[in-house]
C-alpha cells in the first residue's frame, strides 16, 4: 500500500554513493556526429549494456532505501491500555477546556452596523477619495511635527506665602 523513502545512509559508507560518478572518469560522452553521420545508440551494444548496468545499479540503491510501511507490524493495544489512554486524554482535554471558559465570558466585538452585508456589497471607496484622505493625513502629521513649545517664563509662580 504505502512506501516511505528512507533518507538514512549507512555511516560505514559515508556519502560515497552520493558523490560517485555515474559514468567512469576516463569515459567521455560520445559525440553525436561521427564522420558526418549521427551515431545510433542501438548500433553500439556495449553502450546499451553500460546504460542498463547503471540503471540497474540506481534501481538497486533506490530499492535499498525504500521501507514498505504495509509490511511493518502494527502495535496492538490491549483494552485496558486503550481505556487508560482515553482517560488520560479526557483529563488533559478537561484541563485545556477549562482555560477556554474564560474566553466565553468576553463580550463580542462591537457592532458598527446592523446590516454589514449592505456595506460589504456596496461600491468600493473611489481611489481619489483615498488619495485625498492620505494627503490630508500627511499634512496633519507635518503640522503636528512642526509644533514647538518655547518656555519664555516660569510655569510655576511662587505666591508670597509667609
Swiss-Prot record:
Keywords: Endosome, Lipoprotein, Lysosome, Membrane, Myristate, Palmitate. A lipid is attached at residue 2 (N-myristoyl glycine). Belongs to the LAMTOR1 family. It comes from Xenopus laevis (African clawed frog). It comes from the Eukaryota. One of its GO terms (cellular component) is lysosomal membrane. It holds the Pfam family LAMTOR. A lipid is attached at residues 3-4 (S-palmitoyl cysteine). Part of the Ragulator complex composed of lamtor1, lamtor2, lamtor3, lamtor4 and lamtor5. The Ragulator complex interacts with slc38a9; the probable amino acid sensor. Component of the lysosomal folliculin complex (LFC). This is Ragulator complex protein LAMTOR1.
Amino acid at each position: 500500500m504505502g512506501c516511505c523513502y528512507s533518507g538514512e545512509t549507512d555511516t560505514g559508507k559515508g556519502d560515497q554513493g552520493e558523490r560517485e560518478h555515474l559514468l567512469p572518469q576516463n569515459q567521455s560522452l560520445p559525440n553525436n556526429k561521427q564522420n558526418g553521420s549521427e551515431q545510433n545508440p542501438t548500433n553500439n551494444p556495449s553502450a546499451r549494456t553500460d546504460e542498463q548496468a547503471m540503471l540497474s545499479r540506481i534501481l538497486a540503491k533506490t530499492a535499498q532505501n525504500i521501507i514498505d510501511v504495509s509490511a511493518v507490524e502494527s502495535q496492538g493495544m490491549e483494552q485496558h491500555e486503550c481505556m487508560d489512554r482515553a482517560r488520560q486524554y479526557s483529563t488533559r482535554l478537561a484541563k485545556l477546556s477549562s482555560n477556554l471558559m474564560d474566553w466565553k465570558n468576553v463580550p463580542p466585538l462591537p457592532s458598527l452596523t446592523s446590516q454589514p452585508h449592505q456595506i460589504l456589497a456596496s461600491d468600493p471607496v473611489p481611489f481619489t477619495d483615498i488619495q485625498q484622505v492620505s494627503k490630508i493625513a500627511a499634512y496633519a502629521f507635518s503640522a503636528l511635527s512642526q509644533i514647538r513649545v518655547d518656555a519664555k517664563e516660569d510655569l510655576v509662580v511662587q505666591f508670597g506665602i509667609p
